A protein has these predicted regions:
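A long-range scaffold signal marking pre-active-site subdomains of enzyme folds
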Residues: 1-190
Length: 190
């Protein structure tokens, strides 16, 4: 008895909630300030990724380092592991753990996101290369079930972190009318 853990949401109770914005710590905890800080969406435009790739390849061709001033802001604001520009835009830290956050193409394979090194946001699909896997728009957000009491189910928290990428393509067929979602569920209770 008392072992059942649950987090659920109905469509839609205006006052009851089992989920809150933001990542969890490696042991599945968070605080109100973290939830408040992460109550946002991170949007990256595909046209900015294409321009970034062009500028990076031009810098490499000239034998120079890419000037950070030439990196689009949406790439600098992207919540990926090790982003060196994060603190220029936000007053809170990125989590530093093995799960990372937003998926990205890692040009130099160092496992840290740095657009100056040719890195850019991408869609993470297991078994598929990330190098050319970017859409016309990516929206990333993260939420959890441990940020407060479960007022919808009255259940105990699972300590689940959910990282989401919504993405879309501008095309001349039915794909233009679709939005795709990639969910990464991380059980922080183990």
């Amino acid at each position: 008895a008392g072992n059942l853990k649950i987090a659920a949401q109905t469509y839609r109770s205006a006052t009851a909630n089992d989920f809150w914005p933001g990542p969890l710590s490696s042991i599945g905890t968070t605080g109100a300030d973290t939830c408040e800080n992460w109550d946002r969406f991170f949007i990256v435009k595909g046209v900015d990724i294409k321009e970034h790739i062009r500028a990076y390849e031009e810098a490499v061709g000239l034998g120079i380092e890419l000037d950070p001033e030439n990196i689009p802001d949406d790439l600098k604001k992207y919540p990926a592991r090790g982003n060196p520009y994060w603190s220029e835009y936000y007053d809170f830290d990125l989590p530093n753990d093995n799960q990372g956050l937003g998926a990205f193409f890692d040009a130099n394979g160092d496992n840290n996101y740095d657009p100056k090194d040719g890195d850019y946001p991408a869609i993470e699909v297991k078994g598929c290369p990330t190098e050319s896997n970017f859409p016309d728009e990516i929206v990333f957000w993260v939420y959890n079930d441990a940020g407060n009491s479960h007022t919808n189910t009255n259940g105990r928290p699972i300590r689940m972190e959910v990282q989401v990428q919504a993405f879309a393509y501008a095309t001349n067929d039915q794909i233009n009318d679709m939005t795709f979602y990639r969910y990464k569920l991380i059980n922080r209770a183990v």
